[in-house]
Amino acid sequence: MILSQRIQSLTASPIRKLSPYADAAKAAGKKVYHLNIGQPDIATPAQFMDSVREFQAPVIAYSNSKGEMFLLKAVQKYYAEKGMDYAIEDIFVTNGGSEALIFAVMALCDPGDEIMVFEPFYANYTTFCKEFGAKINAVPTSVENGYHLPSEEEIEKHITPKTKAILLTNPGNPTGVVYTEAEQDMISRIVRRHNLALIADEVYREFVYDGAYRSFGTMPELDDNLIIIDSVSKRYSACGARIGCIISKNKELSKQVIKCCQARLCSPILEQVGAAALYTTPASYLEEVNKEYKKRRDTIVAALKKLPGVKASDPKGAFYIMVNMPVDDAEKFAIWTLENFAIDGETVMFAPGNGFYNTPGSGINEARLAYVLKSEDLERAIYILGEALKAYPGRVEK
């Protein structure tokens, strides 16, 4: 058979593509500390499995393409409690936040159109765009500025006739940046001035450790431009449930998104049952989880500061941190570490940073670390990382 150029143009995920090396290390008897993926180790609330066990149905039948009403109402109530008034008609259940993003790109872009992002950015955005022939229009940010946005003038320089949307992750993955209200107001002006869509990926909104957080959904002037992407994956430590949603008050968008939902038939009914139950989780659960991640953030930042030649960002939210390392190539270093380095039978895995950039050559000596392990495991993992840096043949002294 002859495969399409489109599928061959897709890039492997920097988060998962080194998994064969980690699997080989484990097969050789090594313990691998996984800092490469945002898979929380915090227990999923018991409500999820309890509700699934209690679910009674003679047949596991197709569910509503838009999502079951009990879940739609649970999502609606969650947003209402946060000051956002969405109608049931504005909410569509998806197979994770990833499918919500795919639907957004499909609804907005024809081949050759552009989605503006701020790099470094979540690596799968590139794949979601390429699947539909759309392009990433990447605007650089810097660690020196905490990965905050460039000026309004600088952003507008990058807008072209093909630009259809601005896609923001807030809080940021992989940077941990939390945008200020002034930055949000600036983005609001830009998208309305140029009649762009604003795709707000807010799946980490519960994880903010310093200062306040404002959802784009609380800005009524954006009602016609805004598409919110959400998910239960990180919020409730339910990544494998694959339940998310796409939300917008734009009625024309809603008419088109339902076609996508119908084409893939439905989201899994049992996962919808469990997800609806997660929305009944007491606020105290998220408060405790937030405290735990703040502790882990503080742990990894302190540990990284002890490593000579390593520069790290100061994340304010989510559970990721970008680090600049004294190496010739972070991907080569990651492979070398998994294949050739261990301390007492233990090694570490991380995501090479170049996969979070669109600009060729950027991020070559950077890595994204996910601080989703217990603090003592993070300290051990960063110690191993530091010792590996000392031993790595491709170390570059700065």
Segments from the language model and where they lie:
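PLP-dependent class I/II
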Residues: 3, 11-13, 18-31, 37-55, ...
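Glycine-rich loop-to-alpha-helix module at the N-terminal edge of alpha/beta enzyme cores
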Residues: 35, 58-62, 74-77, 81
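Short, surface-exposed loop/turn segments at secondary-structure junctions
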Residues: 62-63, 287
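Short beta-strand to alpha-helix junction loop
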Residues: 66-67
